Amino acid sequence: GQTDGAEYVPPAVPAWDRTTALAALDVTETEFQILNGNVQGYARAREIAINPLAELPAKTTFHELGHILLGHTTETAFNDTEATPRNLKEIEAESVALLCLESLGLPGAEFCRGYIQNWGGEIPERSAQKIFHAADTILKAGRVTEDRDGTEDRPDYD
């Protein structure tokens, strides 16, 4: 039956604006060009493209921004394994997505967790530092605060 007056109100999330974030991070969004339905998104240089059919567009956005902020897209060609091994790159980017989703209370975090657990490797200390820094940068870049007077009101990630 109908429940009167019991309207679902989603919990307040710290406002994060995608357009603001992309501008602040100097990242351009381009049209998605891959016809393979399994690809959710990709990043090159300072560009991201998100599949219009992506199941979790926010998760995919954070993952691709993670690749850029972690420096993956500037390590010569993206598929080159000299610098950071490809599977570790994916884990780093997925970890960035996890932190961003959890901070903003957005769906998809459980998929990130499953992905990271399936990998089963140890995340090196240096990767962990890069991951926290990248997530923090992405969250700050899109943070919409009522007052932009330069005062810091965000929690620190230790």
Q: Regions from the language model: what does each represent?
A:
Residues 1-7, 78-82, 158:
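Intrinsically disordered, low-complexity linkers and terminal tails enriched in Pro/Gly
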Residues 59-73, 93:
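Active-site recognition of the HExxH zinc-binding catalytic motif
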Residues 70-81, 140-143:
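C-terminal helix-coil-helix/basic helical segment that borders enzyme active sites and/or dimer interfaces
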Residues 85, 98-157:
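Long, well-structured alpha-helical subdomains associated
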